[in-house]
Amino acid sequence: MLRHMLKSKIHRAVVTDANLNYVGSITIDRDLMDAADILENEKVTIVNNNNGARFDTYVIEGERGSKVICLNGAASRLVQKGDVVIILTYTVLQDEECHNHKPRLVFMDGNNNIKELG
């Protein structure tokens, strides 16, 4: 049997911008993408801690070191600058792989610095 499992999580990132007039997606600082093992164009689920919105989009690489978390296009209607979000990716594993699987967890501080890796 195949199971959908958490692959990576950026926990409590702060939205730095929301740009309605841009092709839909989320722009994420390349350093954060690397820390969470997220690739450009990878599907992500965004959870907005401020309003409860949960939606899917894809990733655009942001400038390394910029700390950018910018929701673009229609997704920008679901967040505001300063909102705290969780960014999730998933993978599909066989049952026997699930027990040893460890997701990549990136815990953020209030300034989009990596506080801890888990």
UniProtKB/Swiss-Prot annotation:
It is an enzyme of class 4 (lyase). GO terms for cellular component: cytosol. The modification Pyruvic acid (Ser) is found at S25. The gene is panD. Its cofactor is pyruvate. The lineage of its organism: Bacteria, Bacillati, Bacillota, Clostridia, Eubacteriales. This is Aspartate 1-decarboxylase. It comes from Syntrophomonas wolfei subsp. wolfei (strain DSM 2245B / Goettingen). PANTHER family: ASPARTATE 1-DECARBOXYLASE. Is synthesized initially as an inactive proenzyme, which is activated by self-cleavage at a specific serine bond to produce a beta-subunit with a hydroxyl group at its C-terminus and an alpha-subunit with a pyruvoyl group at its N-terminus. Pathway: Cofactor biosynthesis; (R)-pantothenate biosynthesis; beta-alanine from L-aspartate: step 1/1. Heterooctamer of four alpha and four beta subunits. One of its GO terms (biological process) is alanine biosynthetic process. Belongs to the PanD family. Binds 1 pyruvoyl group covalently per subunit. Catalyzes the pyruvoyl-dependent decarboxylation of aspartate to produce beta-alanine. Its EC number is 4.1.1.11. SUPFAM superfamilies: ADC-like (SSF50692). HAMAP family: PanD (MF_00446). It comes from the Bacteria.
